[in-house]
Amino acid sequence: MNKKLIALAVAAASISSVATAAEVYSDETSSLAVGGRFEARAVLADVNKDENVTNTASSEVSDKSRVRINVAGKTDITEDFYGVGFFEKEFSSADSDNDETRYAYAGVGSQYGQLVYGKADGSLGMLTDFTDIMAYHGNEAGNKLAAADRTDNNLSYVGSFDLNGDNLTVKANYVFGGSDENEGYSAAAMYAMDMGLGFGAGYGEQDGQSSKNGNEDKTGKQAFGAISYTISDFYFSGLYQDSRNTVVNNDLIDESTGYEFAAAYTYGKAVFITTYNFLEDSNASGDASDLRDSIAIDGTYYFNKNFRTYASYKFNLLDANSSTTKAQASDEFVLGARYDF
């Protein structure tokens, strides 16, 4: 794999289950593949459970295990034109309503790109993926508007183009407003150079932004910039966001800025990663201005392409106060095992 693809794969820290999916049917024009993962996750939060604090996280081990199942289909319509469909469901180990349909879309594609409709990715996720490379933690300053993230009622385009050995990826999507009038859009571009440097930028807007208990109805606006560099077994990346009227901790934040830094080192079958995440309310002061502030480290060992184990620890730098609960300021330790198929 060349350097530009390593950068896009973020140092192999997250192997997609689609990449290991098994083809269960194929003929001269069509194919069908099934994939997914089984992932056991034990989370220990560094909080005294006996304290009478609202939304306190338990100091006992919490089971966050999950299963994902996906089905992908593709058929050739003409020599240069094809149709695709994809579905993915996630099931939680908890007896709750947390099961989620992650993807459900179909569309068409050619050498000029792919256009799909349904529940599909928005356009800013490929930028937050620059730093969202950990097995469990991270991505705390990469919160996105729903229209820029994975969402339904979504018409999405992605195109990837080779430019003399470099690669340009362009994404754009439009989310149609329903009864909640939350229509929006996002667009982004990413350029990956064969020498290991990658960078990108994007922008998104969405109507109907409001806090959980408020009556606000504002237009959220969000801009991202990202950069990465891969050299030998090392990967470095950074992300910056500037936002207006976005929801954080169920509160509508008028103006916020944030950034993330990530570094990864691959040693044989092991990958070691550290990230720093910071997000602040630009109009607040003192401790109340800090919405996210943490350092995380993890290590993952890949036994083969299908099975891995990992350990991850988050050092939460927030202090519990009137605007931050003890749970939101808690450290976390996670042990996990994952089987991809």
From Swiss-Prot:
GO biological process: monoatomic ion transport
CDD domains cross-referenced by the UniProt entry: gram_neg_porins
Record's keyword terms, sorted: Cell outer membrane, Ion transport, Membrane, Porin, Signal, Transmembrane, Transmembrane beta strand, Transport
GO molecular function terms noted in the UniProt entry: porin activity
Pfam families: Porin_4
A GO cellular component entry from the record: pore complex
UniProt key word Signal: yes
Function field: Forms pores that allow passive diffusion of small molecules across the outer membrane.
Family: Belongs to the Gram-negative porin family.
Name by which UniProt lists this protein: Porin-like protein L
Species name: Photobacterium profundum (strain SS9)
Source species taxonomy: Bacteria, Pseudomonadati, Pseudomonadota, Gammaproteobacteria, Vibrionales
